[in-house]
């Protein structure tokens, strides 16, 4: 295999910024974990836009730059749309959110935890009711 090199950042001349061509899976997961905390579309979209911008421009450790962002202006000017167009896997954030909120995942998690969830019920039935064990 050929030696792998870190991909070069892409310059977006319209906004004078450089962005990574791809988000890392861990970054997508962090965005997803924050998005699912919110219930309204606007809060979710703002979280996706800002966090994608922060990770794509690699300013995650620069709190002063993050605090200086003017979300509404950036949104009106199309900064977030341009970044999503440039970062090839930005759409994976929406897939991650859909997966995290899927019924199949919820059922799988319930099934995994069902024995633990039933223990208190078994104890109550043993003390106060009738429990048939097979």
Regions found by a protein language model. Give the residues of each.
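Short, surface-exposed, charged amphipathic helix/loop patches that serve as local interaction elements
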Residues: 25-134
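N-terminal "first-domain core" detector
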Residues: 1-40
């Amino acid at each position: 295999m050929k030696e792998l090199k870190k991909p070069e950042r892409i310059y977006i001349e319209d906004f004078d910024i450089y962005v990574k061509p791809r988000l890392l899976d861990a970054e997508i997961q962090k965005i997803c974990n924050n998005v699912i905390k919110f219930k309204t579309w606007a809060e979710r979209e703002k979280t996706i836009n800002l966090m994608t911008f922060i990770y794509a421009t690699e300013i995650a450790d620069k709190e002063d730059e993050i605090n200086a962002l003017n979300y509404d202006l950036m949104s009106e000017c199309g900064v977030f749309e341009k970044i999503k167009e440039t970062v090839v896997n930005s759409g994976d954030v929406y897939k991650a959110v859909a997966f995290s909120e899927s019924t199949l995942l919820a059922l799988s998690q319930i099934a995994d935890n069902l024995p633990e969830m039933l223990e208190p019920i078994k104890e109550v039935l043993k003390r106060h009711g009738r429990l048939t064990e097979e």
